[in-house]
């Protein structure tokens, strides 16, 4: 019985699973290409920052992704992301060897892999949401491809920063809020927690949702 339920779920979301795997593989290939040419996406100590000045160097040095070493705005963000990033940090620390494996390279690549998974989840959620609108298949594919290969998405995915987590928290909250519309559930409040840990602009979304829900009632 459980096997039948699992199989039905797989068949129902087979397009989403295929897209998720495709995005992960595509971004890994792009990452491999960039890693062979530059360290810019995880180390800004060099002088060839030709994209734009981000907080990557500061965030990487403070290690806010695994162990926040400052007592400021990064605390909640670190508490959430470290659930996934801390094991990566420990693994990279254990394999780092001055003669063979550079810690910054290993840890930078590990964090980018985590961001690739996060980005793929964001794209998959958007794809699933658009699909429910009954949009033409060609238009759906075109919009998805634009999102995958757009410069903002590529930059947020490859540059070790908080951007991609901010995007995912927004998309995840919107999806949950839409599913729970008109229902009494604490899921919306739970889904809102990451909003408070990344950027203040994300916090506005939670309050806007509260206002709209109140007016609709």
Language-model features, listed with the residues they occupy:
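Short acidic/glycine- and proline-prone juxtamembrane loop motifs at membrane-interface regions
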Residues: 158-164
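Specific aromatic-rich, kink-prone transmembrane helix
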Residues: 149, 153, 165-182
């Amino acid at each position: 019985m459980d096997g039948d339920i699992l199989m039905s779920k797989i068949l129902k979301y087979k397009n989403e699973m295929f897209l998720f795997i495709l995005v992960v593989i595509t971004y890994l290939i792009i990452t491999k290409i960039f890693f062979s040419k530059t360290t810019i996406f995880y180390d800004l100590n060099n002088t060839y920052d030709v994209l734009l000045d981000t907080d990557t160097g500061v965030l990487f040095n403070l290690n806010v992704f695994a162990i926040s070493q400052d007592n400021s705005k990064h605390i909640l963000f670190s508490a959430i992301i470290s659930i996934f990033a801390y094991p990566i940090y420990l693994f990279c620390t254990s394999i780092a060897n001055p003669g063979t494996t550079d810690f910054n390279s290993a840890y930078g690549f590990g964090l980018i892999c985590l961001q690739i998974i996060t980005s793929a989840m964001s794209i998959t959620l958007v794809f699933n949401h658009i699909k429910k609108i009954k949009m033409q298949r060609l238009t759906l594919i075109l919009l998805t491809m634009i999102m995958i290969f757009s410069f903002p998405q590529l930059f947020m995915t490859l540059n070790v920063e908080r951007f991609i987590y901010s995007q995912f928290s927004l998309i995840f909250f919107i999806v949950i809020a839409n599913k729970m519309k008109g229902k009494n559930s604490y899921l919306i409040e739970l889904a809102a927690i990451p909003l408070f840990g990344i950027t203040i602009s994300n916090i506005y979304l939670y309050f806007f949702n509260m206002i709209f829900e109140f007016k609709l009632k």
